[in-house]
């Protein structure tokens, strides 16, 4: 059976991701255990919150190098919302905080615009 690991680092919408995967017939495991993450067939990094706080939690749980290993070994890896942002090198939101560096670039803030502007919320 395929194992899909959802990384738990206290900054994610874990249950909604788990529920969606379960509805698709998958059996995901929510974990912060490095062995479970490294042995998974697929890995998901969800996220809600600020770039700096989330990177701090990944360091606290000693998951930064684990995630980099997952990418290096070619395991399919999906970042959702903040999880995708963390895959980049840095973010303007938290100047001086290094991201995972799996993708080149910096996450930019949406610039302020005069007048009413609507943004799509997904």
Please annotate each region the language model reported.
Residues 120-121:
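Conserved small/polar residues in nucleotide/adenosyl-binding loops
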Residues 1-78, 82, 88, 95, ...:
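N-terminal beta1-alpha1 cap of cysteine-dependent amidohydrolase-like domains
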